[in-house]
UniProtKB/Swiss-Prot annotation:
Assembly with partners or alone: Homodimer. The RNAP catalytic core consists of 2 alpha, 1 beta, 1 beta' and 1 omega subunit. When a sigma factor is associated with the core the holoenzyme is formed, which can initiate transcription.
Family statement: Belongs to the RNA polymerase alpha chain family.
SMART domains: RPOLD (SM00662)
GO cellular component: cytoplasm; DNA-directed RNA polymerase complex
Gene name linked to the record: rpoA
Keywords: DNA-directed RNA polymerase, Nucleotidyltransferase, Transcription, Transferase
Reactions catalysed: RNA(n) + a ribonucleoside 5'-triphosphate = RNA(n+1) + diphosphate
Species whose genome carries this gene: Rhodopseudomonas palustris (strain HaA2)
This protein's name: DNA-directed RNA polymerase subunit alpha
Length: 339
């Protein structure tokens, strides 16, 4: 037994299906199938943990408010106290290019509401939730705040954002760097051919808009891939590349596909099996009348098969010259990647 069989003979997802939500930059559902039994839970849990804890993003580290010495103060003419203002600042979502720390400022006079959209940013910082309310100013009130923005990962508590030489009036803020806000997943049964014992992994991802959900999942998968490399203690034997000579066929290679690989109901599949219909090439040569004479084969099964064939550009009653070929089993194996 070659060592490659340990991973090469496991089934792998055909593709990742991404369905965007109401806002494609923030919401999406991703489906991967089929997976080996148990892999849905394994991959879903690992990806969820990495998505929430390990992706890089930008956030406010600290704020300096003119005339304020500490976060337990109040500001004349400002309805919220400083503690509430700091909590609102923590919810500012940012996208930043390059390295930090960087500065951004907001200055406003009342009456009115100060929002994240009022913040003056440099060119490589974008406020992603400009409607977020920071504080409310009464008539004649004025406020000026200077924010320190940096990049990081996961969640960093305010205490860790306080530098040792912090000036008086610098208020550290809890930093939520992760661009991912919510992740959930579920694992269901799925089928591959006639086998139902596989996993289907469905992930629902919400971001703050700094990353699209599918990019976030891609980065999380890359992190896991990089972390797992240290456990691989061998080099794979190099595969000799030989140019395979593909014979010319007098018919569509899809005819070499076995009918049990089609996603048919159990009843329809059993009827075909009982009638010794093994390959699609056997099936398409049958007429509708011939199919309806098959025991236990009804109009519902006929319509199901016609629909599946139509999706492949095929139909019943076709003429297939040169069918069946003498070496049909060998040809089916050689052409399995071509249909």
């Amino acid at each position: 037994m070659t060592i490659q069989k340990n991973w090469q003979e496991l089934i792998r997802p055909n593709k990742l299906q991404v369905t965007a939500g109401s806002d494609a930059t923030r919401f999406a559902t991703l489906v991967a199938e089929p997976l080996e039994r148990g892999f849905g839970q394994t991959l879903g849990n690992a990806l969820r943990r990495v998505l929430l804890s390990s992706l890089q993003g930008a956030a406010v580290q600290s704020v300096h408010i003119d005339g304020v010495l500490h976060e337990f103060s109040s500001i004349a003419g400002v309805r919220e106290d400083v503690t509430d203002i700091v909590l609102n600042i923590k919810d500012i979502s940012l996208k930043m290019q390059g390295e930090g720390p960087k500065r951004m400022v907001v200055k406003k006079q009342g009456p009115g509401v100060v929002t994240a959209g009022d913040i003056q940013t440099v060119g490589d910082i974008v406020v992603l939730n400009p409607d977020l309310q920071i504080c409310t100013l009464d008539e004649g009130a004025e406020i000026r705040m200077e924010f320190t923005v940096n990049t990081g990962k996961g969640y960093v508590a305010a205490e860790r954002n306080r530098p040792e030489d912090a000036p008086i009036g610098l208020i550290p803020v809890d930093s939520l760097y992760s661009p991912v806000r919510k992740v959930s997943y579920k694992v269901e049964n799925t089928r591959e051919g006639q086998i139902l014992d596989y996993d289907k992994l469905t992930m629902t991802v919400e971001t703050n808009g700094a990353l699209t959900p599918d990019d976030a999942v891609a980065f999380a998968a890359r992190i896991l891939q990089d972390q797992l490399n240290v456990f691989v203690n061998f080099e794979e034997p190099r595969k000799e590349v030989t140019q395979e000579i593909i014979p010319d066929l007098a018919f569509n290679p899809a005819f070499l596909k076995k009918v049990d690989e089609l996603e048919l109901s159990v009843r329809s599949a059993n009827c075909l099996k009982n009638d010794n219909i093994v390959y699609i090439g056997d099936l398409v040569q049958k007429s509708e009348a011939e199919m309806l004479r098959t025991p236990n084969f009804g109009r519902k099964s006929l319509n199901e098969i016609k629909e599946v064939l139509a999706q492949m550009g095929l139909h019943l009653g076709m003429e297939v010259p040169g069918w069946p070929p003498e070496n049909i089993d060998e040809l089916a194996k050689r052409f399995e990647d071509h249909y």
